Each structure stands twice: as structure tokens, then as C-alpha cells.
UniProtKB/Swiss-Prot annotation:
Keywords: Glycogen biosynthesis, Glycosyltransferase, Transferase. This is Glycogen synthase. Pathway: Glycan biosynthesis; glycogen biosynthesis. The keyword Glycosyltransferase applies. Coiled coil: none annotated. HAMAP family: Glycogen_synth (MF_00484). NCBIfam families: glgA, PRK00654.1-3. Its EC number is 2.4.1.21. Pfam families: Glyco_transf_5 (PF08323), Glycos_transf_1 (PF00534).
Length: 524
């Protein structure tokens, strides 16, 4: 099946949040199931230098009264075809923000739609978050292209200053004025990034004023849990670590803890309970809750805290003040550093995620993979991925609390600290977390089912059936599934521009999209 991912981020080239990880890791897992998966994203100024293969122009066109070019290259890590929408509006280093943010991403969405109609026509166009929210609206009138829309974070619904009442028929939409609502209405299928979050967003507590609409479309809404790349995130082979380790041999983790304490200026003590946090420093992540309990925790327990991230100035200031009150025990690094984040996962004893809401969360998966026990609030994807530790049953992988209250968070931290004081049972807890399977292979099977459902196909793709049989302990039948990979026949291949398009004679075409023409305006 031909699948085109359209997104504002894609790791490792452009990553601001978890969406970048998903768009960078899910496509190769789908390709393993036999799908022809490609990606299209804005050609940001900072992106071009990260490419291993130079991007070549293959097509030029106009949309919304503005000319653009599409460049083709390959993803630097998974090798899948990558298309970049080139226009000066994407040249600045910034990814988000700015007064023209709504125009930029609507323009990108329209360009991606034009590309799908004119250059490479997918069977499924998979859109991610509000930045691509108008694509399902435009594709709604094309019976040959099905759309899937993934909600990574419902809170960010997209600024919108144009009057959409002239292009949408649904009265529900009139209550909103953003692209997220349009996508929810017009996408053929909608999914959230965890089963629990898919249920939560249908309530007033987590629905961000869209719970009525989400209940209205509940028949096409589902939750599919995110995964992680188990090869890229493997403490046994991670070259960024001073020492490697595994669930069978945890010795290297002590070395990582020592190096982390040295690098962050903490007092060297292997027996101190070291808490790590790698996060955007925003309201969602519960950093304010940490600030409310940290002084008391440090006063009554032998604990150290390491925080890595950037975000809200007020939260950054609060963390700096906390570190100044507790030199040698609290370290704050206000940036994002991939190598340091891996060292924090590897060197910390426990990982903090006291989130107000959490669509899925990937950090807790990285933490468990690196033997770092998560302390989380029971919300969203954290419910689906971190079963609570039960010392009597010797089950669970982390410490959980219910209410977003300082006393609940503090109690969970004290329970974790007390468990840490029993080394043997703590190692068992670490091993259980490290041995969890949150690979993309499982998630890819769910997406495969959704793709086939939306396209009206009853049988799973050949490789998907083989993988599912294998995961259930059955022997796959090569004769039934067509071997290890699926190759589309020439008749199934979507038309693509001839090679002359990349030789410099790139044609300019006007929009085939009536809605884009309706909205078409020159940038102000």
C-alpha cells in the first residue's frame, strides 16, 4: 500500500516534541510490513545541512497564489524517500511561532495536497497534528485518497484567522476556529497516540473544548500506542554512554551514574537516590509540581535531582532557584542535548513524569529501556505503559499517583525512595522495565489494520500477517504471505513525474484544489 506521511517534524532532522520521534520511527516499521512509505515536510533552513543525500528539485507548482518547489532526498537514518517543500517562508531557523505560523502551515498542507494529486498519489495520506489539519478537508472530495489524522497533542489546535464557515458544512465546526477541528471532521480515520488518551479526550477534563466533536466522531476514533526504536535506544550498544549494560548485567549503570554526577556537578555518592527529568519545561509536564515538593523531599531523603530541558521562563527560573538552594544536589541544564539525555536515562535511578496530561509519552519508555524506574501520574499513555509496582506480587514497572496534587506526587516519590533502599528488589524492578516490548512493530500492525480498514481492504498486508503469526508463536506460511516483502506491481504504482523533472525543467502548475483556490491569497 502507498502511504504518504505529512508532518511538521521528523526525527532526527527536526524534532521539537514526540511527534518528531513518531514520524521518524513509524514509517520504517510500516515499510517492514511491505508498505511503500514516503514522507513530506517543510524544507526548514536548519534541515538541509543534516541530509546525507543532497535534495534535488523534482517539481514546481503554485498554490494559494504562491509558487513553491518540491525537493527529493532520502531520510538520513531509515533511507525512505523524503520530500521537502521549498519556499523562503521556511528558511528561518524557527520551526514554530511567528505571526505567519498559520499561513506557513496552511501553505505547507496545501502544497502536500498538490503533491499528492499531481506527483505521487498515495492510497493513504497520514497527517499529523494541526499543521496538516486542512489536508483531510481538501482530500475529502477525492475518493482515491483516504486520510488518517493522528492527534499527538489536542491542546495545540492551531491558530486560524480565516473564515472557514464558507468551506465546511458541519455545524459542529462553527464552534471552533482552528485546523484541528477541520481535521477531526473530515479525516476518514482519526487516532490518538494511546488508548487511554483516546478515551480521555472525549471528556470535559481533557477534551480541550472539543469533547463534543470527539464524541460525535467516536465511530472513527481509536487509540494506538506509540513505540520506540529498540535498536537506536539500546543501553547494551549505545555509543553515547560511558559504559554499556543490559537487563542481564546492570554493572555499567553504576558507571553511568558516577559520570552523570561528575558532569552535572553533583556530590559523588553511588547510594544517593538520583532522580532524572528530560522534558519540555511547560505547564503540561508538571514541572510546577516538582518545584512544590522538591525542597521537602531533599530535606528528608538522600536524593539528587537532574533536569534537562527548555521552555517556560518562569519554570526555568524556578528550577535555577532550586539548584541554587541545593548545590551539589540539584543540577539544571536548560537546553536539549541528545547525548546528555541518554546519560540521564542511563545514570538516573528514577525518572519523573508528573504530567497534567500525557497523550502517550515516550520518555518513560526510554527510561524503562535504560533501567530508570518511572514515577508518573496515572494519565494518558502513562496508564498504558507504566503498570504500578506491587512488591508483593513482584509486578509492575514504576510508581504511580492519581491526583495532580503535591501530596500525591510526594508520596509516590517517597515510596520510590524507600524501594530503592532494597537493592535486590530494586534491580528486579529495573529488569522488568528493561524487558518490556514497546517496539514500533506492534504499533505498526495496528496502523496497518487501520489503513486497510479505511481503504476497504479485508485481509491484512502479507508481511503484517506474517509478523502477527510470528508474535503469536505460529509459523508463518511463506506461500500465503508472499515471502518477506511485498512489491507493488507496475499497475499499482502511482504515477510520478518523469526524470526530466529533476533536470531543471520543473513545470509550474496551477492548483487543482478548488478549496485552495477559494482560500488563495498572496501572503501579506
Amino acid at each position: 500500500m502507498r502511504v504518504l506521511f505529512a508532518a511538521a517534524e521528523c526525527a532526527p532532522m527536526v524534532k521539537v516534541g514526540g511527534m518528531g520521534d513518531v514520524v521518524g520511527s513509524l514509517p520504517p516499521a510500516l515499510a517492514q510490513l511491505g508498505h511503500d512509505v514516503r514522507l513530506i515536510m517543510p524544507g526548514y533552513g536548519k534541515l538541509w545541512s543534516s541530509l546525507d543525500i543532497p535534495a534535488e528539485p523534482i517539481w514546481r507548482a503554485q498554490t494559494m497564489g504562491t509558487e513553491f518547489a518540491v525537493f527529493e532526498t532520502r531520510h538520513p537514518t531509515n533511507g525512505l524517500p523524503l520530500y521537502l517543500v521549498g519556499h523562503p517562508v521556511f528558511d528561518p531557523e524557527r520551526i514554530y511561532g511567528g505571526e505567519d505560523e498559520d499561513w506557513r502551515f496552511t501553505f505547507f498542507a496545501s502544497a502536500a495536497a498538490e503533491f499528492s494529486w499531481n506527483v505521487w498519489k498515495p492510497q493513504v495520506l497520514h497527517c499529523h497534528d494541526w499543521h496538516t489539519g486542512m489536508i483531510p478537508v481538501w482530500m475529502h472530495q477525492d475518493p482515491e485518497i483516504s486520510t488518517v489524522f493522528t492527534i499527538h497533542n489536542l491542546k495545540y489546535q492551531g491558530p486560524w484567522r480565516w473564515k472557514l464557515d464558507r468551506i465546511t458544512w458541519c455545524p459542529w465546526y462553527m464552534q471552533g476556529d482552528h485546523t484541528m477541528a477541520a481535521a477531526l471532521l473530515y479525516a476518514d480515520r482519526v487516532n490518538a497516540v494511546s488508548p487511554t488518551y483516546a478515551q480521555e479526550i472525549r471528556t470535559s477534563e481533557y477534551g480541550e473544548k472539543l469533547e463534543g466533536l470527539l464524541n460525535y466522531i467516536s465511530g472513527k476514533l481509536r487509540g494506538i500506542l506509540n513505540g520506540i526504536d529498540l535498536e537506536a535506544w539500546n543501553p547494551a550498544t549505545d555509543k553515547a554512554l560511558p559504559a554499556t549494560f543490559s537487563s542481564a548485567n546492570l554493572a555499567g549503570k553504576a558507571t553511568c551514574k558516577q559520570v552523570l554526577q561528575e558532569r552535572m556537578g553533583l556530590t559523588l555518592n553511588p547510594d544517593t537516590f538520583l532522580l532524572g527529568m528530560v522534558s519540555r519545561l511547560v505547564d503540561q509536564k508538571g514541572v510546577d509540581l516538582l518545584l512544590q515538593v522538591a525542597d521537602r523531599l531533599l530535606a528528608y531523603t538522600d536524593t539528587q535531582i537532574v533536569v534537562l530541558g527548555t521552555g517556560d521562563r518562569g519554570l526555568e527560573s524556578g528550577l535555577w532557584q532550586l539548584a541554587s538552594r541545593h548545590p551539589g544536589r540539584v543540577a539544571v541544564f536548560l537546553t536539549y542535548d541528545d547525548a546528555l539525555s541518554r546519560l540521564i536515562y542511563a545514570g538516573s535511578d528514577a525518572f519523573l513524569m508528573p504530567s497534567r496530561f500525557e497523550p502517550c509519552g515516550i520518555s518513560q519508555l526510554y527510561a524503562m529501556r535504560y533501567g530508570c524506574v518511572p514515577v508518573v501520574r496515572k494519565v494518558g499513555g502513562l496508564v498504558d505503559t507504566v503498570p504500578p509496582h506491587d512488591p508483593r506480587q513482584k509486578s509492575g514497572t514504576g510508581f504511580c499517583f492519581d491526583r495532580f496534587e503535591p501530596v500525591d506526587f510526594y508520596t509516590a516519590l517517597v515510596r520510590a525512595w524507600e524501594a530503592f533502599r532494597h537493592p535486590e528488589s530494586w534491580k528486579e524492578l529495573q529488569r522488568r522495565g528493561m524487558e518490556q516490548d514497546y517496539s514500533w512493530a506492534r504499533s505498526a500492525l495496528e496502523y496497518d489494520r487501520m489503513y486497510r480498514d479505511v481503504c476497504g481492504l479485508k485481509e491484512p498486508s502479507p508481511d503484517a500477517a506474517a509478523v502477527e503469526q510470528f508474535s503469536q508463536g505460529q509459523e508463518a506460511d511463506p506461500s500465503r504471505h508472499g515471502g518477506a516483502s511485498q512489491t507493488l506491481s507496475p499497475s499499482e504504482e502511482a504515477p510520478i513525474e518523469s526524470s526530466e523533472a529533476s533536470s531543471g525543467s520543473t513545470p509550474v502548475r496551477t492548483s487543482r484544489n478548488p478549496l485552495a483556490r477559494l482560500l488563495g491569497k498572496q501572503r501579506r
